[in-house]
């Protein structure tokens, strides 16, 4: 199993027999379980000794679309967070977005918020207030991955691979970067 821990970051543990139907670890080894885990850290992989479910997010697991978006967010975490790297912000962000998703909020919007906030955690902060080339704040028409930010109408030719944006999209990207997910 791989779980994200508030205190120790990403932790890989072995849960012996978790796939068996009558095993005590069956319920805590399901996807997206928020719980309390007790594990033994040996020389190799840690071993799960005990686990209690706090919340299992059944509404996410029962809807394929929600499950897909939640799995995508979990995979982003798995790929970007180093083993045993403490990051309480990402733990709280992921948990909060799972809760919001279970309450019925749009999983696509929640995932976009997660992706935007993950760029900051990865050390990449795109320029979302003005054109990265000339500094103009009006007529933002595209986003350049190469330049890591918005391009105005005049500078959009600087990057032939720039992604053209609807005016509302640039506003949403700014909002996603700064929004408090608790709201």
Spans of model-derived segments:
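Non-catalytic alpha-helical scaffolds and adjoining flexible linkers that form interface surfaces
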Residues: 1-183
């Amino acid at each position: 199993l791989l779980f994200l821990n508030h205190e120790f970051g990403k932790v890989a543990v072995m849960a012996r027999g978790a796939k068996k139907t009558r095993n005590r670890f069956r319920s805590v080894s399901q996807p997206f379980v928020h719980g309390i885990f007790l594990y033994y850290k040996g020389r190799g992989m840690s071993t799960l000794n005990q686990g209690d479910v706090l919340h299992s997010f059944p509404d996410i697991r029962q809807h394929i679309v929600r499950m897909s978006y939640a799995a995508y967010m979990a995979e982003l975490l798995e790929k970007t967070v180093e083993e045993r790297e403490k990051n309480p912000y990402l733990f709280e962000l992921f948990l909060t977005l799972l809760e919001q998703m279970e309450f019925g909020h749009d999983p696509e919007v929640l995932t976009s918020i997660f992706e935007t906030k993950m760029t900051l955690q990865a050390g990449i902060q795109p320029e979302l207030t003005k054109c990265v080339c000339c500094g103009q704040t009006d007529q933002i028409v595209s986003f350049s991955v190469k330049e890591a930010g918005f391009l105005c109408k005049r500078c959009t030719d600087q990057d032939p691979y720039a992604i053209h944006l609807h005016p509302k999209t640039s506003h949403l990207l700014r909002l996603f970067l700064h929004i408090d997910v608790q709201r």
